Amino acid sequence: MEAAKPRLRVRINDSYVKVARLVAGLGVATVCEGALCPNIFTCWGEGTATFMIMGDTCTRGCRFCYVKKGVPEPLDPLEPYKVALAVDALGLDYVTLTSVDRDDLPDGGASHFAATVRAIKRLRPDTIVEALIPDFQGVEEHVRLVAASGLEVLAHNIETVERLTPLVRDRRAGYRQSLRVLEIAKEEGVVTKSSILLGLGEDKSEVIEAMRDLRSVGVDILVLSQYYRPSRKQLPVAKRYSLSEFRELAEKGLRMGFAYVVAHPLARTSFKAKEAYLAAVRRVEAEGGGRRA
């Protein structure tokens, strides 16, 4: 039987309305809306948002994702500044950037990502910036361009276990390729993060193995969440994990050495992002290192 998404009672407060109006007014997009994120009211209600840059149309066809697929529009050269203006107007001290895949662009959009980070830093130097990036087809120089742009956190999701990757993700993605992206980012000295969706048909032992693989390339922050089928066009849910199973996996992750583990059915990559980043920084400081993990 397909797992049903929990029904939540939410309150739309003034902060939510402020974010919604500002985002619409500047013509910038958020993944909160585009991917039907279950935490939209929580995050927007706290005056935070994850901005989706480079359009709303993805060049890939991952079988779990609700984001529109097709031929994207050309990039908006003013978008980095529009996003920076939105971040400044909202007074955010932590912002997450993400995007669709743009395999139609020579660098996959890496330079656009970097320009957006720099634009934010020019207006708000103390704002912590996280970028949840595509794999840029595994091209090392493109990953390094974003990782060295001045951000604090680089996230890239492996999404699922190695065995299911060909079924779940687009054929141009790769499990080992994604691990290498995270390894390159860590070489640039930034905090790294990755997420795994549970309930796509994996065994728990495969999840633990994927967690070990992430630690082997130095990933600091792990996010585990339940897969919910956005529509009948996506893969069905194979299993619904219990809260106790999430707690068990979180405990295993902490024992493996992750600085922070977000494990909850409704968790997404940007959920509790600031809290997770600060935990990673505290770990580095406790070990006698610098600011970055």
Swiss-Prot record:
Keyword Protein transport included in the entry's annotation: no
Catalysis: reaction(s): [[Fe-S] cluster scaffold protein carrying a second [4Fe-4S](2+) cluster] + N(6)-octanoyl-L-lysyl-[protein] + 2 oxidized [2Fe-2S]-[ferredoxin] + 2 S-adenosyl-L-methionine + 4 H(+) = [[Fe-S] cluster scaffold protein] + N(6)-[(R)-dihydrolipoyl]-L-lysyl-[protein] + 4 Fe(3+) + 2 hydrogen sulfide + 2 5'-deoxyadenosine + 2 L-methionine + 2 reduced [2Fe-2S]-[ferredoxin]
Positions that bind [4Fe-4S] cluster 2: C58, C62, C65
Binding site for [4Fe-4S] cluster 1: C32, C37, C43, S270
PROSITE patterns (alphabetical): RADICAL_SAM
Radical SAM core domain boundaries: 44-259
Any GO CC annotation of this UniProt entry: cytoplasm
InterPro entries: Aldolase_TIM, Elp3/MiaA/NifB-like_rSAM, Lipoyl_synth, rSAM
SMART domains: Elp3 (SM00729)
Top-level EC class as recorded in UniProt: transferase
Superkingdom classification of source: Archaea
GO molecular function terms listed in the Swiss-Prot or TrEMBL record: 4 iron, 4 sulfur cluster binding; lipoate synthase activity; metal ion binding
Cofactor descriptive note: Binds 2 [4Fe-4S] clusters per subunit. One cluster is coordinated with 3 cysteines and an exchangeable S-adenosyl-L-methionine.
Family listed: Belongs to the radical SAM superfamily. Lipoyl synthase family.
Protein name (Swiss-Prot/TrEMBL): Lipoyl synthase
Native organism: Aeropyrum pernix (strain ATCC 700893 / DSM 11879 / JCM 9820 / NBRC 100138 / K1)
Lineage per the UniProt record: Archaea, Thermoproteota, Thermoprotei, Desulfurococcales, Desulfurococcaceae
